[in-house]
Amino acid sequence: MSPAGEHGTAAPIEILPVAGLPEFRPGDDLGAAVAKAAPWLRDGDVVVVTSKAVSKCEGRLVPAPADPEERDRLRRKLVDEEAVRVLARKGRTLITENRHGLVQAAAGVDGSNVGRDELALLPLDPDASAAALRARLRELLGVEVAVLVTDTMGRAWRNGQTDAAVGAAGLAVLHGYSGAVDQHGNELLVTEVAIADEIAAAADLVKGKLTAMPVAVVRGLSVTDDGSTARQLLRPGTEDLFWLGTAEAIELGRRQAQLLRRSVRRFSAEPVPAELVREAVAEALTAPAPHHTRPVRFVWLQTPAVRTRLLDAMKDKWRADLAGDGRPAESIERRVARGQILYDAPEVVIPMLVPDGAHSYPDAARTDAEHTMFTVAVGAAVQALLVGLAVRGLGSCWIGSTIFAADLVRTELGLPADWEPLGAIAIGYAAEPAGPRGPADPGDLLIRK
């Protein structure tokens, strides 16, 4: 592609340290100090200053106790105050997002390059700080420079830290190549270069961490002021592929597993992978059961003719039962139409209560209690199956119709006489996917004694 479209330059660039700067304190004029130490600034230069220097001048220092444990306790309190959410924890390290949207360790609260009786916070508005320094240098030296405020950050998937821009003024922080064509004729579709971060990292080569050199100048780049700021470098958490740490993502998944289960009544035509159903059934079979038994069987209607024959027979019986109740024809057809979901769903599974291993009692009361216990166990397995399907992205709907036609179901499917159908489960990908529902308010449904 043409050099005019490049974000960098083929010409040499210079990275110049700004020596002779004082130890900054609250209220100091940062712009005046830089102008005095670097009267050689030119139009087009990029002035790169550490956020620590800005924080000191802006009074973002917090008195801290000298005792290491108390100092660390205060640091953690400040992290909680500065952070709007915690993305990840590992040992004593917290990765947080602050109110500006910056994601970094400890919300930018830092105890390096400050007195042992202080802790530093990030500038309240790093973009505004960059703009103010740019304006001050224009006022004092008559030059048009760009300004970056930087901080040190870790990087996903890679060891080590590098400086990145947290505040910017006077340059395009991003350069998009979408639609451009390289020298081999390949169209660049998604490439977008974070120019501000590249400059920040380069400038750190002369600033260092131990040299008391908080300001550097990058010279030789052709920068364009498009009005963008460092905020444009931030991707909102919900749009990021890695917006939670591993442990936090697993915890969220566990918390949402139950809430993902919803009654889905309209499915897409997308086929359901058989292995997903098998995996969900395998998990459902771990549900609690009495006497170490297996009180449930899942009958998977995989043969279309078998499913249709069963549903047609159930429909005829349902019509006859409703007619026997004296219902009008329109009411009967409305009720019968509710079962259409079992015709339309990509997959249907029928849970069966199987009394293998049930204890025998001479009296009806204990016999009924034993049956209830097995019924509860099958219900637990059904719920586990529905949740297992949901966490795999599959929708489902439990329908009780087979309970009302137990003999018919056993006959049509050739099942033993003591197997009891406990509904039917329609399975498929939801036509309109939905996220997890909110939990219910227990209210007076949770009774305390």
UniProtKB/Swiss-Prot annotation:
Taxonomic superkingdom: Bacteria
Keywords attached to this entry: GTP-binding, Ligase, Magnesium, Manganese, Metal-binding, Multifunctional enzyme, Nucleotide-binding, Oxidoreductase, Potassium
Amino-acid positions noted as binding a divalent metal cation 1 in the UniProt annotation, renumbered to this chain: D110, D151
Listed SUPFAM superfamilies: CofE-like (SSF144010), FMN-dependent nitroreductase-like (SSF55469)
GO biological process terms, semicolon-separated: F420-0 metabolic process
InterPro entries: F420-0_g-glutamyl_ligase, F420-0_gamma-glut_ligase-dom, F420_FbiB_C, FbiB, Nitroreductase, Nitroreductase-like
Disulphide bond pairs: none
Note on how the cofactor is bound: Binds 2 divalent metal cations per subunit. The ions could be magnesium and/or manganese.
Record NCBIfam families: F420_cofE (TIGR01916), F420_FbiB_CTERM (TIGR03553), PRK13294.1 (NF009810)
Protein known as: Bifunctional F420 biosynthesis protein FbiB
Gene source species: Mycolicibacterium paratuberculosis (strain ATCC BAA-968 / K-10) (Mycobacterium paratuberculosis)
Upper lineage: Bacteria, Bacillati, Actinomycetota, Actinomycetes, Mycobacteriales
